[in-house]
């Protein structure tokens, strides 16, 4: 596996967005709606402000560690022991989250298009793609991710626009939903919707411009775009569906566009969106494997990481 030492600012932002936004395609906004009710928009705005504030605070703290990722900082603070603990935790976390997301997405594909195919075979396709990408180069993964990220965000924006005719604005009432405590206190847990921004603290050592100013720019742009997409998706789902409706195993964003058509020859636009989302999840898994391999390289101090690729993909 050939490596790439440095990435540009826009490539770094694309890496963060693909990881943090992919959950929107599944059921993240729906989970917020079910738990919070009609005050979901207020809650999402609230947690978005908190996420932006926390990102600003962390960016300020990072000024003294320009060009260092979370493992370099851990080694500085607690030596190799803390570095290894943090590294193992991050690897386990990435594997756990990736496994859940890919499983959920493959379940959606199984229900919608491949009812006669066992979901394990669908998962295997994603794993094989990630394995091949890991053997080719990180450069290819990062460059491809930049294109897929643009298509993914564009597809989400079109999805939001298509939902406008189906919106019923009375569904925002009561504005406070189940009350202030549920919206602002209990709903504070939804700030973990931004946990994909963890990637932000893995990339400083990969940046072409490792200055604190550039890191701050990447952090703010990433969290703002993620916040905007989360707010828009929540607005679309709240105004298009009743908030008490639970749509199990099928992406609510898919249902938003499934009843739209463009003329006689393009009657199923959702198929095109699914294609983009499949590419997006493949890229997501490629990135997850890439970061795990980079972490393992730091922890075990080896130059050739290829022997880890197949066992990692099997996990």
Residue map of PLM features:
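Hydrophobic, membrane-embedded alpha-helices of multi-pass small-molecule transporters
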Residues: 8-27, 43, 47, 51, ...
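Membrane helical hairpin/interfacial module
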Residues: 25-119
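Membrane-water interface regions at transmembrane-helix termini and the short interhelical loops
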Residues: 34, 104-110, 127-148, 206-211, ...
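Helix-loop-helix connectors at the membrane interface of multi-pass transporters/channels
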Residues: 72-75, 102-120, 208-213, 217-229, ...
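Small-residue-rich segments of transmembrane alpha-helices in multi-pass membrane proteins
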Residues: 77-89, 148-163, 223-231, 313
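Alpha-helical transmembrane segments of helical membrane proteins, especially in multi-pass transport
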Residues: 90-93, 229-241, 267-313
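Hydrophobic alpha-helical segments and their helix-loop junctions in multi-pass secondary transporters
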Residues: 95-98, 102, 134, 151-176, ...
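Membrane-interface interhelical connector segments
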Residues: 240-269
């Amino acid at each position: 596996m050939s490596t790439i030492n440095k990435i540009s600012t826009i490539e770094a932002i694309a890496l963060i967005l693909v990881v943090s936004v992919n959950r929107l395609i599944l059921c993240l906004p729906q989970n917020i709606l079910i738990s919070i009710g009609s005050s979901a928009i207020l809650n999402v705005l609230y947690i978005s402000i908190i996420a932006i504030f926390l990102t600003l605070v962390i960016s300020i703290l990072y000024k003294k560690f320009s060009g260092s990722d979370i493992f370099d900082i851990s080694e500085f603070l607690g030596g190799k022991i803390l570095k290894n603990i943090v590294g193992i935790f991050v690897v386990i976390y990435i594997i756990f989250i990736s496994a859940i997301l890919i499983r959920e997405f493959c379940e959606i594909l199984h229900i919608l298009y491949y009812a006669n195919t066992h979901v394990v075979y669908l998962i295997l396709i994603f794993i094989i793609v990630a394995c091949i990408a890991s053997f080719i180069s990180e450069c290819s993964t990062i460059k491809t991710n930049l294109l897929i990220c643009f298509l993914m965000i564009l597809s989400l924006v079109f999805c939001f626009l298509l939902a406008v005719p189906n919106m019923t604005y009375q569904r925002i009432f009561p504005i406070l939903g189940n009350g202030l405590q549920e919206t602002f206190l209990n709903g504070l847990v939804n700030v973990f919707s931004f946990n994909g921004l963890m990637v932000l603290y893995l990339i400083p050592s990969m940046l072409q411009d490792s200055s604190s100013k550039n890191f701050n720019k990447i952090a703010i742009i990433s969290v703002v775009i993620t916040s905007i997409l989360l707010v828009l998706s929540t607005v679309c789902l709240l105004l298009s569906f009743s908030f008490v409706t639970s749509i199990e195993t099928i992406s609510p964003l898919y249902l938003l566009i499934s009843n739209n058509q463009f003329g006689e020859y393009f009657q199923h636009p959702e198929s095109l969106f699914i294609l983009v989302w499949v590419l997006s999840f493949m890229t997501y898994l490629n990135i997850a494997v890439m970061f795990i391999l980079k972490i393992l390289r730091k922890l075990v101090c080896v130059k050739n990481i290829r022997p880890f690729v197949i066992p990692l993909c099997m996990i």
